[in-house]
Amino acid sequence: MDYEFKMKTQQERAKVEDLFEYEGCKVGRGTYGHVYKAHRKESNDTKDYALKQIEGTGLSMSACREIALLRELKHPNVINLIRVFLSHTDRKVWLLFDYAEHDLWHIIKFHRAAKATKKPVMVPKGMVKSLLYQILDGIHYLHSNWVLHRDLKPANILVMGEGNERGRVKIADMGFARLFNAPLKPLADLDPVVVTFWYRAPELLLGARHYTKAIDIWAIGCIFAELLTSEPIFHCRQEDIKTSNPYHHDQLDRIFNVMGFPQDKDWEDIRKMPEHHTLTKDFKRSNYANCSLVKYMERHKIKPDSKAFHLLQKLLLMDPNKRITSEQAMQDPYFSEDPMPTADVFAGCPIPYPKREFLTDEDQDDKGESKRQQQQQQQQQANQQAQQNQQQQANHQNQQQNQQQQANQQNQQSQQQQQQQQMQQQQQAQAGGMDHSAAKRVRMSGPNGQPGNGMNQQDYQVQQAQQAAAAAAAAQQQQQQQQQQQMMFNNQQQGGFQQRY
């Protein structure tokens, strides 16, 4: 490409900073980048817009996927991508959307805080129904076009504020969305872990490779329950961590504590899940015998015979093949009873929720410092755990060494006892031989203990010296612990021998 033509094209290309005013109007941040509330410069257009700056330089795969899908998808309940800005100077990417003043995360947070007061304010029933219907309508459109959202959660469900689309639901953040009509490989191979843990379907947690649009339905069921109770139904303390292993023990435990352990008859394919062996090893069915969705919702004052509960049950079926579809859910009797769902989820009433606050760099620094402190605490806990593990290993090794020493001592004592028994047997045999020789000499001796006719005085003295030497040699063979006993025994033997003579 001609250099001059390239430079001319860049100069003519619109720049986001020339068209929009957004400085000091940051309303959101995340791993994706930053979001600003913006309005046009030098224009009669008073409409507010959302400018999403993609983190990093250039286009990431997630950004490319989101741009490609949103340029094709057009539905009242799916966020509208108006324009894409590419800055060739700093290689920044900007996405321009319609601005939504509210989202379900802030709305539910507002009502959860109200529950702590003496006069709790729940999300109005009509508003819950309208929110759910519009979410289902938007997801039905995505599924009809072979798109899985894969990251549905309250923060990604936007609600428009005052304006032409007041109270309209907008499904946002398509960074994890995928086409599923004919993937080149199993979806689990592309992204092993998707969806925030609290809204993750059980088949994902058990390592399903060929998962379907039922994972979005499970997430909608979680959002529905949260709207009814103002509490995350499958709240788990574990943070959302990207990992290649989809199995998550604590999240499964939380699901079973609410739903109960799945029966084989209720989920026939559970044995085919890649992590089924780990599941049976880590969990006992009997621990969740008294758990059920009925009991959980009754604690939150949701009657099990209500149409809302019946629909919730269909959305939160463990078996993805039995889980209701978005189209079937929209035709559920829940939506045909009063109050009927409305296009404006606020039903024309004043909006009680505060507008988004602008974030400052100090907020960012505070959050960064808080994050660093949290990381330091986690590191300290990890170090303490490692030290405890090392101490346990050292204690175990010391215990093994002590046991080995005790075993060696027992073996030595056993060997000493055997040697003592053998020596005693030898001594008894020698004593018997000495008694026999003494008796023979008595028969051969004359009066007053003198040698008899068969032995002269010299032979007698030689024989006596030999016997004394033999007794001394036997005494030396005994161990130190038995020396005194052996010497007493020899003295007794010698004393008896002298008495005979």
UniProtKB/Swiss-Prot annotation:
Superkingdom of this entry's organism? Eukaryota
Cited SMART domains: S_TKc
The record places domain Protein kinase at: 21-335
Q: What is this protein called?
A: Cyclin-dependent kinase 8
Protein purpose: Component of the Mediator complex, a coactivator involved in regulated gene transcription of nearly all RNA polymerase II-dependent genes. Mediator functions as a bridge to convey information from gene-specific regulatory proteins to the basal RNA polymerase II transcription machinery. Mediator is recruited to promoters by direct interactions with regulatory proteins and serves as a scaffold for the assembly of a functional pre-initiation complex with RNA polymerase II and the general transcription factors.
Alphabetically sorted, this entry's keywords are: Activator, ATP-binding, Kinase, Nucleotide-binding, Nucleus, Repressor, Serine/threonine-protein kinase, Transcription, Transcription regulation, Transferase
Which InterPro entries does the UniProt entry name for this protein? CDK, Kinase-like_dom_sf, Prot_kinase_dom, Protein_kinase_ATP_BS, Ser/Thr_kinase_AS
> Which residue stretches belong to region Disordered?
333-501
| One Gene Ontology molecular-function label | RNA polymerase II CTD heptapeptide repeat kinase activity
The subcellular location is: Nucleus
Q: Which cofactor does it need?
A: Mg(2+)
Q: Low complexity compositional bias: what residue ranges? A: 373-431, 446-501
Q: Which GO terms describe its cellular component?
A: nucleus
**So where's the catalytic machinery, residue-wise?**
151 (proton acceptor)
E.C. number(s) listed in UniProt: 2.7.11.22, 2.7.11.23
Source organism: Aedes aegypti (Yellowfever mosquito)
Could you confirm whether the keyword Transcription appears in this record? yes
- Which protein family is named in the record? Belongs to the protein kinase superfamily. CMGC Ser/Thr protein kinase family. CDC2/CDKX subfamily.
Pfam families in UniProt: Pkinase (PF00069)
How does this chain assemble? Answer: Component of the Cdk8 module of the Mediator complex.
Q: What class of enzyme is it?
A: transferase
**Does the entry annotate any disulfide bonds, and if so which pairs?**
none
* UniProt record, GO biological process: G1/S transition of mitotic cell cycle; protein phosphorylation
- Its predominant location is nucleus
Binding-site positions, ATP: 27-35, 52
